[in-house]
């Protein structure tokens, strides 16, 4: 209990922390991290995770990882469950659509799992072709690869069916505001931490490609370069009680 109290005081944590001597509770719930060998000093820790609960204490969302170094950021979880964000955004407008981009987090560290967000709003009578469409250029997001960054496939929302009667064709499109999310993990391996230690920021670049049409005109495919810069912060390696 003294260890938890010292940790809470150092990190200004005001909510209750529960002690789990012998990892009894996490074993009961199947959360003990089975990737950690018994001889390892960290044996007995849980899989890193966050449970989101409602006012009645019911679990409404779960976010877990296998490596104990990886953590979903609070901001990325809030965006995932539909909460508003105050993240600074970049806005770009074209005759076909408006684009707003932001990172869920302004600063990350080794092991951070966060998200890059693109909000697209097609103009009046305009639609953008959805992934999987053939014959047109579907919307796509291509991240430029770089060391120590892991990327999940971009997440696109469900599309809608658009019927173009003159050609008797039905295709999947986005005609209403929609969001693309790119989940990013900063590696926490030894080589990654050594390389990131000398860096104070991280810039991620990508290319957004789409083709927009209205009820009369098929516009040429458009390519938009997009970038995000996040600050890199050092890991907190101080143990509870300053030991």
What are these regions (language model features)?
Residues 1, 21-22, 56, 122, ...:
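A generic "binding-loop/recognition-motif" signal
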Residues 1-25:
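Structural microenvironment flanking redox-active thiols in thiol-disulfide oxidoreductases
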Residues 12-16, 31-51:
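Structural micro-motif
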Residues 19, 63-65, 130:
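Glycine-rich, histidine-containing beta strand-loop boundary motifs that form or position
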Residues 26-30:
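Short, charged, surface-exposed secondary-structure boundary motifs
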Residues 41-101:
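Thiol-/selenol-based redox modules, centered on thioredoxin-like
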Residues 78-243:
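Extracellular/lumen-exposed scaffold segments
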């Amino acid at each position: 209990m003294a260890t938890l109290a010292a940790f809470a005081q150092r990190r200004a944590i005001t909510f209750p922390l529960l002690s789990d001597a012998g990892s009894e509770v996490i074993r009961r719930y199947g959360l003990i991290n089975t990737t950690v060998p018994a001889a390892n000093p960290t044996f007995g820790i849980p899989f890193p995770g966050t449970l989101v609960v409602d006012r009645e204490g019911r679990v409404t969302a779960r976010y877990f990882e296998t490596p104990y170094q990886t953590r979903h950021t609070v901001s990325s979880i809030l965006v995932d469950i539909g909460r508003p964000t105050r993240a600074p955004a970049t806005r770009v407008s074209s005759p076909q659509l408006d684009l707003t981009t932001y990172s869920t987090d302004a600063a990350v560290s080794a092991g951070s799992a966060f998200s890059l967000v693109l909000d697209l709003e097609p103009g009046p009578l305009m639609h953008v072709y959805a992934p999987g469409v053939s014959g047109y250029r579907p919307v796509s997001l291509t991240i430029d690869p770089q060391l120590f960054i892991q990327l999940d496939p971009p997440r696109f929302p469900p599309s809608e069916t658009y019927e173009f009667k003159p050609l008797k064709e039905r295709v999947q499109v986005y005609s209403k505001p929609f969001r693309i999310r790119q989940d990013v993990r900063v590696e926490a391996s030894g080589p990654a931490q050594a390389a990131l230690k000398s860096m104070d920021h991280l810039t991620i670049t990508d290319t957004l490609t789409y083709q927009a049409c209205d009820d009369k005109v098929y516009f040429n495919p458009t390519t938009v370069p997009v970038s995000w810069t996040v600050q890199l912060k050092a890991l907190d390696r101080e143990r509870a009680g300053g030991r």
